Amino acid sequence: MRKLLLLGAGYGNMRILLRLLNKDLPEDIDITLVDRTPFHSLKTEFYAIAAGTVPDSEIRVALPEHPQLTFVEGEVFRIDAEQQFVELGDGKKLQYDELVIGLGCEDNYHDVPGAAEHTYSIQTIGDSRQTYQTLLGLPGGSTVGIVGAGLSGIELASELRESRPDLKIKL
């Protein structure tokens, strides 16, 4: 059996799965998908969770099901490329023949002093929930600074204007 190990249930690995599982997948291939959550998240919508305009249940997408696909919930602790295995946070080791690493990205603070220490993230559902809770607790008239004016920053500012018109928002 050949083992394909996919790390991360983000857009990249979902695309790989859809392409492989919608074709005649050779019987000698087993696919294992590892992610910290048992669903795919529409990451481009995390700003709406942070702003409180959409519940996180609306941006969860069920993972595909297939007899040759196994899902493992966990966090990657270590990758041993030489021995061809991935160790998860709980100590479980997963062997592979082919590995795809699609674990997402990290926040970019654009060299803004203090941003790394004093900001909240919307990179994960958990981060977005925490950001929402913090924003919810702000008194009216508070100023919210958004570091980064890319798509997510603009979307967050727009949604915050809708959900919290009492806040001052700066990009």
What are these regions (language model features)?
Residues G10-Y11, I125, G150:
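Alpha-helix N-cap/helix-start capping motif
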Residues M1, Q68-G145:
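FAD-binding core/adjacent interface of flavoenzyme oxidoreductases
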Residues Y109, L151-E155:
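Short, well-ordered, mixed-charge alpha-helical segments that flank or form enzyme active sites
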Residues M1-T70, G145-I146, E155-L171:
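Beta1-alpha1 glycine-rich phosphate/pyrophosphate-binding loop at the start
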